[in-house]
Amino acid sequence: MSEERIPKRSEVPEQFKWALEDIYATDEKWAEDLQKLKAMPERIAAFKGRLGESADTLYDFTQLSDEISVLCDSLGNYAQRRSDEDTANAKYQGFLGQLMNAYVAVNSAGSFETPEIISIEEDKLQKFYEDKPELKLYKRALDKLRRKKAHILSEAEEKILALTGEMGQSPENIYSMFSDADLRFPDAVDKDGKTHQVTHGSYIPLVQSEDRVLRKSAFESMYGTFDKFRNTCAATLSAQIKAVNFYAKARRYDSSLEAALDGTEVPVSVYKNLIEAVHDNMHYMYDYVALRKKLLGVDELHFYDLYTPVVPDADMKITFEEAKETVLKALAPMGEDYLAILKEGFENRWIDVYENEGKTSGAYSAGARVHPYVLLNHKDTLNCMFTLAHEMGHAIHSYLSNKNQPVVYSDYVIFVAEVASTCNEALLMQYLLKNTEDKKQRAYLINYFLEQFRTTLYRQTMFAEFELKINEMVAAGESLTAEGLNELYGELNKLYFGDGIVLDDEIKLEWARIPHFYYDYYVYQYATGYSAAIALAQSILKYGVPAVKDYIGVLKGGCSTDPISLLKGAGVDMATTQPINEALAMFGELVKEMEEAMAE
């Protein structure tokens, strides 16, 4: 693809576009299915007040729910993918709007489901399973719903809580508008006096620059701007944490952490184990910080020095064809069945490969039931090859889950999702390290791997600890002020990075830049997922077929059991600190290897 000009959608060759016709051959077929969805509220309403009536009635309702799930999957995937391939196309924005209206009507019509199911007496439900054996398939789903009984309020109270929904979203919406739409940063200036625009998107590339003057200038531009609005940011974050704690309290949970993790069936101990294990392995990060300072040859290491590569770019230009070929070779340990699905995805246009005008940025995988779809904006870089391996990990997870689970258990939770993608990245990295003889390229790869550990395992755990602490402060009746948040965030940076780096005042404001603090205990899953993936990749390379078989079992499992049990089946026990300790020990070994490689 030409890099001089971004092509229009119509100019992209067919083989580099995803095959959305596999979902609907035409837009008219989509519209026909939308009419079917619009008719669903009437069918749902026929069950109101009747779910506890008989086994047959409850079973028929589960079948209708499955039918609606499949319909929404097809309608949603087609409309969203069409919109994402060219966001300027108003037609598909309209499709999404129509679909959302129909979806809201369906949800509203089915609002009786939870209260009716939790009110069925246990003896009666057991009798239903005996009367209708087919209903047993839904036992786990029904049990999961019924477990929430202690946290479901009276009808009047539920109505009041529902009315607060939009209000509860306000802190995140206000922060998002402030940070993404209103905030402007002064230009950064490089060593030659040339100016560079600073945005949320350009910030990381700027602090990755070899020009230290530019790095410092971008750093001061970003955090100096947030400093001017520190009280606003503290107020929005405080409102968010108060809202989270209000809902947890209203639903009779012991803490906001328990409330957030309950939905994904992850014990609170898993979250706290992660923080404890990383604390026990801080010395590896201190070693890495010391090595980074040494390799950059600076008198003092600052936070704006953390992102710049310590190894000059090894000029690893990798075309999309080469990336596919390398990923296939790297994932060979996964076995022929896995590779066959990977090849099917490569050959049958599951992937939308290159950038075009109006196309959504970044990369993702969407698990449509017909087959997964992957959006890329491929450039010929090492990073883009890792993105391909990562997103195909998600895609094959979706494919195997959909093929092996009934509709009701085909979705998987984020806690497991990040394992499937990151395991592929770990296998790709091990393959490249094993097959790269060029010393410069090898050092570049190790640096890339070390940065993945730093930004995923250490950094996301620090975020998770900060989030836990500010929730605990609010629960204890303490106020969240800009000064207090700065102090806490500064202390955590000191703890995680040690004395080998200067604690710049600006970094204490980083909490104000992170949108994930509005996502309610989300970030820890990046760190746990990374640890589990490293453990699984090591196991696959060490034990071969038996380990692969166990891991494929995880990918086929969907949400047929809780995520901790699912991973335990593949030999990774996330209820303990062992996988995290082992991953961090590997980070320690890589730091040593990097030091040796750069000494030669």
Regions found by a protein language model. Name each.
Residues 295-333, 339, 397, 444, ...:
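Long, K/E/R/D-enriched contiguous segments that form extended
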Residues 316-318, 351-370:
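Catalytic zinc-binding patch centered on the HExxH motif and its immediate surroundings
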Residues 329-340, 366, 394, 398-406, ...:
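Conserved helix-loop functional segments at active or binding sites
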